[in-house]
Regions:
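Cytosolic regulatory regions of ion transport systems
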Residues: 1-481
Length: 481
């Protein structure tokens, strides 16, 4: 596939690197000479210094032969206008725009909704020519809400139906400690699947001989209703979240507060596929008076405090350390980590930290942070989900992007269609986690005798960038604009 990316910042360069690793033809465009030079030194792709919103410049970069365009500049309007411009001349190209401004994002979402209502779900053209619109803050807030739903005991990967993958730390007291997977399978009450293991900084797909050690992070596939039991197996406990303190009055914090307001819950929880909130008590703390005022105007019923969250007087007066959960969601990612670690030392039960990317996960773990929300990884995963073809529904990276968990529809051209899993001799380095054949009403964890039919949906884990595995399941990518 040929993909043109406009914007050679950190996210644009990270996306280009991931796409090049899959063998795609990537063209990265930016009008900043220094960013172009830096990207050109680091990436094995075409990097061009040009005005990305100029159609002539894009055509010189090979726009007419492109499959997709991704706009990641720092200017939301440029990102949106560029997509509209390209759509007018090349409607077949899939266009993805990052829009950071929440108001811009919501207005576009609303226009798209009205177009669908007026013309039906099969409307010929997307609003503003944008096939897929993403807002990093909305994606991050959604991840925070998912973590809150299950007590912030670990991170959770949303996959098929009633299932999820819980990424949990194995405690010293865990029933899984120092046991092989084949022995874990015989434990009373164990009806789950360990999909991957992160041990000593390395992520592996386990086999029956793999030994689970205290301190390991394990990805456990289970029904959502069984999460409290899964937590017990790893030595953790399911803890209700009632009182929440949020550090930072930035966009992600505002969206998190909005999701907890009774008048907004129907919208937010239908948008993100969550259950309704449990009536949590929220307090937001920020040192910036203007941000506090803005948030207070938006949510008059919320408790907004101006101050330093590490100030002993504030901690004592507001009894901050007795909260159930502290969410560090400011725009300063390094301070989020340090604040989370400090609050954990002061006795806060659970902490969530918003970070720049998954490179900080290992450090966060050593600092005692329960859950990290890596902003750039979330954005990359969302974009990659859209660039794998219409049969690929979602992509979640794990283990510093070593592996990916992919949800897809089995194409009639797929090599696995109509075959039993035990007859698939080319699954090395991958694992089928869930399957749902066309006649099935629910997802199931398959076994060797399970046949995967054409039109089925499947969730599998494979090495990142292994396009052969993706095509084996989903067939050759076909983009749909």
């Amino acid at each position: 596939m040929k993909i043109i990316i406009i914007g050679a910042g950190f996210t644009g360069s990270l996306l280009a690197k991931a796409l090049v690793a899959e063998g795609n033809n990537v063209v990265l465009i930016d009008d900043d000479a220094e960013r172009v030079r830096s990207a050109g030194d680091q990436l094995d792709c075409t990097v061009i210094e040009a005005d990305g919103k100029n159609l002539s410049s894009l055509e010189k970069a090979g726009l007419d032969g492109a499959d997709a365009l991704v706009t990641l500049t720092g200017d939301d309007e440029v990102n949106m206008i560029t997509c509209a411009l390209v759509d007018a001349a090349y409607p077949h190209i899939v266009k993805i725009a990052r829009v950071r401004d929440y108001d811009h994002y919501m207005r576009t979402v609303e226009v798209s909704r009205r177009i669908r209502e007026r013309n039906g779900e099969t409307s010929s053209r997307p609003a503003f020519g944008i096939d897929y619109l993403l807002n990093p803050d909305v994606e991050a807030a959604g991840s925070i809400m998912h973590a809150m739903e299950i007590g912030a005991a670990g991170s959770f990967i949303e996959i098929g139906g009633d299932y999820t993958i819980a990424v949990l730390t194995v405690r010293d007291s865990s029933r899984l400690s120092d046991k092989r997977l084949k022995d874990i399978a015989t434990l009373e009450g164990w009806n789950y699947l360990i999909a991957f293991v992160e041990s000593d900084g390395n992520t592996v797909l386990p086999n029956g001989q793999t030994v689970i050690k205290p301190g390991d992070h394990v990805g456990i596939l289970a029904r959502k209703d069984d999460l409290s039991k899964v937590l017990e197996f790893t030595g953790s406990v399911s803890m209700p979240i009632d009182r929440v303190v949020i550090f930072g009055a930035d966009n992600v914090s505002a969206l998190t507060v909005a999701s907890q307001m009774e008048e907004n819950q129907s919208f937010w929880y239908s948008l993100l596929g969550l259950g309704r909130s449990k009536g949590r008590r929220l307090t937001v703390i920020d040192r910036d008076l203007e941000r506090c005022r803005n948030l207070s105007e938006k949510f008059p019923s919320a408790r907004i405090l101006k101050g330093d969250i590490t100030d002993d007087g504030l901690l004592h007066d507001e009894n901050i350390c007795d909260c159930d959960l502290m969410i560090a969601a400011s725009g300063n990612y390094e301070r989020n980590l340090m604040t989370s670690a400090y609050m954990k030392l002061r006795g806060v039960r659970r902490v969530i930290a918003l970070t720049s990317d998954s490179a900080f996960d290992e450090i966060a773990d050593k600092l005692g942070v329960d859950v990290t929300i890596p902003m750039r990884d979330i954005v990359i995963d969302t974009i990659m989900s859209r660039l794998r073809g219409s049969n690929v529904k979602s992509v979640h990276s794990i283990g510093a992007r070593k592996f990916e968990i992919i949800t897809c529809e089995i194409s009639d051209r797929s090599r696995v269609a109509g075959r039993r899993i035990k007859d698939m001799d080319d699954l090395d380095g991958s694992l089928i986690l869930l399957a749902k054949n066309p006649a099935d009403s629910e997802w199931t964890i398959p076994n060797g005798n399970t046949a995967i039919e054409s039109g089925a949906q499947a969730v599998f884990i494979a090495t990142s960038g292994d396009t052969a595995k993706i095509r084996m399941f989903a067939g050759k990518p076909e983009m749909s604009s």
